[in-house]
Amino acid sequence: MKKSTKYESTVKDAKTLESVIPKQLAEYTTRALSKLNEALGGDVGGYVANRLHMSHEELREALAAEQIDGVALAVYNIEKRGQSVVIGDQTGIGKGRQAAAMIRYGLLSGYLPIFFTDRYTLFCDMYRDCKALPVGGINLSWSI
């Protein structure tokens, strides 16, 4: 019996990580993404590009389709529901890149993003991910 299924992104013009999703989560994930896509008029990528102040090309260069979906869900939850989100992706799907996108979103939206980790070695990874999503005119400073 197959335990996972191919992830279907709402963003069709971005690179994909060829992710799979546990079969028991597929229906709920598809439903959530469909509702989001409908709420955003079918342009999830455009929504994220707008919120991150990036062109479509810059966005597609920095984030994969799965990551764009994750960032869209997070931003939408903040803006429309006043809620947070937990990124529960497996290793290698880009939780750090999504977190960096949310740091960028926070800085551009007047929030003070704070990154916590239990492993100091992850700060280098987060710095690299933030550099991949640069925020013009904002100096990334780090305290350890």
Show the residue positions of the predicted features.
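Phenylalanine-focused residue identity feature
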Residues: 7, 47, 76, 115-116, ...
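Intrinsically disordered, low-structural-confidence terminal and linker regions
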Residues: 1-32
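Conserved Walker A/P-loop ATP-binding site and its immediately adjacent core
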Residues: 95-98, 102-144
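Conserved aromatic-histidine-acidic binding/catalytic patches
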Residues: 58-63, 90, 111-114, 118
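Walker A/P-loop
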Residues: 82-102
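Generic, low-specificity signal for short hydrophobic/alpha-helical stretches with a mild N-terminal bias
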Residues: 18, 52-56, 108, 112
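Conserved pre-motif I regulatory segment
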Residues: 22-88
